[in-house]
Amino acid sequence: LYWDDGTFNVYAIYPRMDKVLSLDSQPFSVALDQNTPKTATSLGGYEASDLLFASQKSVTASDSPVSLLFHHIMSKLRIRLIKGEDFEGELPTKAKVYIHSTFTSATVDLRQGIVTYNPNVARQSIIAHQDDETSYSAIVVPQNITTRMPFLEVEVNGVSYFYESRFNYKPGVENLVNLI
């Protein structure tokens, strides 16, 4: 990288974006199926949905590297299935977990590292990534769901169990929901 005289602002985002259309409102969407595994040539649905941002302002030319501290700008939801007192049998090790009623499209301000959901696109459902036998995670666009509506669905052997709630997905925050 050639440095000219003067000061510069350095911005970095992960994962890499192939086409940057706007620094102020770059379109971005989380994967609807975040349980899709990564391959030799592409990220899995979960990893491709997470955005990390770093910036360093007023950098001048030098031989030293520019230090960048990355932070998450999306929200993370973790769901744990816990065996309750009245549950008979064993917890399923292969369930399908859906996060419903979320905006999955957003714009990103690549100068500020701020994600804003796109209210002009219909709410959708996300298939969560299975972390282990009873834990699931999904990356969600920051948003506040103020109306009580279907929130989580756990599908086991063709039977669905629903949980309704309001929810506030904050940027850079991991939320944990225990389903008993």
Model-derived features: positions:
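Short, low-hydrophobicity acidic/polar segments
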Residues: 1-91, 135, 147-148, 153-161, ...
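Residues in well-ordered beta-strands of folded domains
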Residues: 13, 98, 139
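Intrinsically disordered/low-complexity terminal segments and short unstructured peptides
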Residues: 106, 115, 133, 145-146
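Short amphipathic beta-strand/extended segments with alternating polar/hydrophobic composition
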Residues: 110, 127, 162-168
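Extended, solvent-exposed segments with strong compositional bias
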Residues: 117-133
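Short, hydrophobic beta-strand segments
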Residues: 137-144
